[in-house]
C-alpha cells in the first residue's frame, strides 16, 4: 500500500509519483503522512518536504502553500518548489550566507517591509540548502 503524491507549483509539476511516506513542513510543525491517513487540509510553511520511496528519501524545497490528504492521495499546492537533487548546493550555500548577512545588517532596526523580506529570503535559502543536502 502506498501514497500518490503530487507537488504542483503554478508553473510546473514538481513531483508526481508513489511514496511510502511523506513528511510535510506545516505551519504548526512537521506532519507525517502514511498510507491510510485521515483526510485533512494543512497550511504549509517554507521548508523541506521529505518523500520516502523506493527505499530512499527525496527532498523538495517548498516555499509555502497547502496540502490536501484524501485517502491515499496527497496533493501539495505551492507557490514555488525545487527538487533537492536539482539544487546546486554550493550556490545555495552562497545564497544562504548572503541572506544571513542581509538579516544581520537589519538587527536592531524597527520592523519594516525590508526586514520581513530579508527574513523570508533567509527562510527560503535555508530550505534550499537543507533540500540539497538531504538526498539519499
From Swiss-Prot:
Membrane topology according to the record: Peripheral membrane protein
Region (Disordered): 88-136
Sections of the chain in a coiled coil: none
Membrane-crossing segments per the record: none
GO annotations of cellular component type: plasma membrane-derived thylakoid membrane; proton-transporting ATP synthase complex
Keywords carried by this UniProt record: ATP synthesis, CF(1), Hydrogen ion transport, Ion transport, Membrane, Thylakoid, Transport
Alphabetical list of InterPro entries matching this protein: ATP_synth_F1_dsu/esu (IPR001469), ATP_synth_F1_dsu/esu_N (IPR020546), ATP_synth_F1_esu_C (IPR020547), ATPsynth_dsu/esu_N (IPR036771)
Molecular-function annotations in GO: ATP binding; proton-transporting ATP synthase activity, rotational mechanism
Main subcellular location of this protein, as a coarse class: membrane
Protein location: Cellular thylakoid membrane
Complexes and interactors: F-type ATPases have 2 components, CF(1) - the catalytic core - and CF(0) - the membrane proton channel. CF(1) has five subunits: alpha(3), beta(3), gamma(1), delta(1), epsilon(1). CF(0) has three main subunits: a, b and c.
Function, in words: Produces ATP from ADP in the presence of a proton gradient across the membrane.
Record-linked PANTHER family: ATP SYNTHASE DELTA/EPSILON CHAIN, ATP SYNTHASE EPSILON CHAIN, CHLOROPLASTIC
Assigned protein family: Belongs to the ATPase epsilon chain family.
Record NCBIfam families: ATP_synt_epsi (TIGR01216)
HAMAP family found in the cross-reference section: ATP_synth_epsil_bac (MF_00530)
Annotated protein name in UniProt: ATP synthase epsilon chain
Name of the encoding gene: atpC
Amino acid at each position: 500500500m502506498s501514497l500518490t503524491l503530487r507537488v504542483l507549483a503554478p508553473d510546473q509539476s514538481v513531483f508526481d509519483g508513489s511514496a511510502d511516506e511523506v513528511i510535510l513542513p506545516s505551519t504548526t510543525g512537521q506532519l507525517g503522512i502514511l498510507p491510510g491517513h485521515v483526510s485533512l487540509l494543512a497550511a504549509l510553511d517554507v521548508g523541506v518536504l521529505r518523500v520516502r520511496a523506493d527505499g530512499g528519501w527525496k527532498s523538495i524545497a517548498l516555499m509555502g502553500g497547502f496540502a490536501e490528504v484524501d485517502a491515499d492521495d496527497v496533493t501539495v499546492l505551492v507557490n514555488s518548489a525545487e527538487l533537492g537533487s536539482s539544487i546546486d548546493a554550493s550556490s545555495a550555500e552562497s545564497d544562504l550566507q548572503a541572506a544571513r548577512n542581509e538579516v544581520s545588517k537589519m538587527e536592531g532596526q524597527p520592523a519594516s517591509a525590508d526586514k520581513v523580506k530579508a527574513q523570508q529570503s533567509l527562510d527560503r535559502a535555508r530550505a534550499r540548502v537543507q533540500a540539497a543536502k538531504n538526498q539519499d
